[in-house]
Amino acid sequence: MDSLIIKDNTVIGCSETDILSLKIPEGVTAIGDNAFLDFKKLSEIQLPSTLKKIGDRAFEGCESLKLINIENVSMIGVRAFAGCKSLSKIHFGDNI
Protein backbone atom coordinates (compact mmCIF):
# COMPACT_ATOMS: atom_id res chain seq x y z
CA MET A 1 0.00 0.00 0.00
CA ASP A 2 1.49 3.31 -1.11
CA SER A 3 0.10 5.25 1.83
CA LEU A 4 2.04 3.19 4.39
CA ILE A 5 5.14 4.85 5.78
CA ILE A 6 7.80 2.19 6.32
CA LYS A 7 11.31 2.76 7.65
CA ASP A 8 13.82 0.01 8.47
CA ASN A 9 11.13 -2.70 8.11
CA THR A 10 8.87 -0.90 10.61
CA VAL A 11 5.52 0.68 9.77
CA ILE A 12 5.66 4.10 11.41
CA GLY A 13 2.41 5.49 10.04
CA CYS A 14 0.02 5.88 7.16
CA SER A 15 -0.77 8.98 5.14
CA GLU A 16 -4.47 8.06 4.88
CA THR A 17 -6.30 8.09 8.21
CA ASP A 18 -9.78 7.15 6.96
CA ILE A 19 -8.93 3.76 5.41
CA LEU A 20 -11.25 0.79 5.94
CA SER A 21 -8.83 -2.07 5.36
CA LEU A 22 -5.10 -2.47 5.20
CA LYS A 23 -2.56 -5.10 4.15
CA ILE A 24 0.93 -4.73 5.53
CA PRO A 25 3.53 -6.24 3.18
CA GLU A 26 5.77 -9.22 3.90
CA GLY A 27 9.17 -8.19 5.19
CA VAL A 28 7.77 -5.74 7.74
CA THR A 29 8.93 -6.87 11.20
CA ALA A 30 7.35 -4.22 13.43
CA ILE A 31 4.49 -1.76 13.73
CA GLY A 32 5.75 1.34 15.48
CA ASP A 33 4.31 3.23 18.43
CA ASN A 34 1.13 5.16 17.53
CA ALA A 35 1.30 3.94 13.90
CA PHE A 36 -2.48 3.65 13.54
CA LEU A 37 -3.61 5.63 16.59
CA ASP A 38 -7.27 6.70 16.24
CA PHE A 39 -7.83 5.21 12.78
CA LYS A 40 -11.51 4.98 13.68
CA LYS A 41 -12.71 3.50 10.35
CA LEU A 42 -10.07 0.75 10.10
CA SER A 43 -12.03 -2.50 10.38
CA GLU A 44 -9.70 -5.06 8.82
CA ILE A 45 -5.94 -5.48 8.79
CA GLN A 46 -3.81 -8.24 7.32
CA LEU A 47 -0.44 -8.63 8.99
CA PRO A 48 2.57 -10.33 7.39
CA SER A 49 4.07 -13.57 8.70
CA THR A 50 7.31 -11.62 9.26
CA LEU A 51 5.75 -9.32 11.90
CA LYS A 52 7.30 -9.79 15.37
CA LYS A 53 6.48 -6.59 17.30
CA ILE A 54 3.46 -4.32 17.75
CA GLY A 55 4.41 -1.04 19.42
CA ASP A 56 2.78 0.98 22.19
CA ARG A 57 -0.65 2.37 21.24
CA ALA A 58 -0.18 1.01 17.68
CA PHE A 59 -3.92 0.44 17.17
CA GLU A 60 -5.34 2.41 20.10
CA GLY A 61 -8.68 3.98 19.24
CA CYS A 62 -9.30 1.82 16.15
CA GLU A 63 -12.97 1.56 17.07
CA SER A 64 -14.03 -0.45 14.01
CA LEU A 65 -11.27 -3.10 14.12
CA LYS A 66 -12.99 -6.49 14.49
CA LEU A 67 -10.37 -9.22 14.09
CA ILE A 68 -6.61 -9.45 14.13
CA ASN A 69 -4.23 -12.37 13.58
CA ILE A 70 -0.97 -11.99 15.49
CA GLU A 71 0.30 -15.56 15.36
CA ASN A 72 3.98 -14.73 14.82
CA VAL A 73 4.15 -11.66 17.06
CA SER A 74 6.32 -12.05 20.17
CA MET A 75 5.97 -8.55 21.65
CA ILE A 76 2.88 -6.36 22.09
CA GLY A 77 3.31 -2.86 23.49
CA VAL A 78 1.33 -1.04 26.15
CA ARG A 79 -2.23 -0.09 25.15
CA ALA A 80 -1.66 -1.53 21.66
CA PHE A 81 -5.38 -2.30 21.31
CA ALA A 82 -6.91 0.06 23.89
CA GLY A 83 -10.23 1.53 22.79
CA CYS A 84 -10.77 -1.09 20.07
CA LYS A 85 -14.36 -1.58 21.16
CA SER A 86 -15.37 -3.70 18.14
CA LEU A 87 -12.44 -6.10 18.50
CA SER A 88 -14.06 -9.48 19.13
CA LYS A 89 -11.37 -11.95 18.11
CA ILE A 90 -7.58 -12.09 18.32
CA HIS A 91 -5.66 -15.09 17.00
CA PHE A 92 -2.51 -15.61 19.08
CA GLY A 93 0.42 -17.84 18.24
CA ASP A 94 2.72 -19.68 20.62
CA ASN A 95 5.14 -16.73 20.87
CA ILE A 96 3.05 -14.62 23.25
Please give the residue ranges for each predicted region:
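Consensus positions within tandem repeat domains that build extended binding/scaffold surfaces
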Residues: 12, 33-35, 55-58, 77-82
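Structural signature of tandem-repeat unit edges
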Residues: 1-6, 16-30, 39-53, 63-75, ...
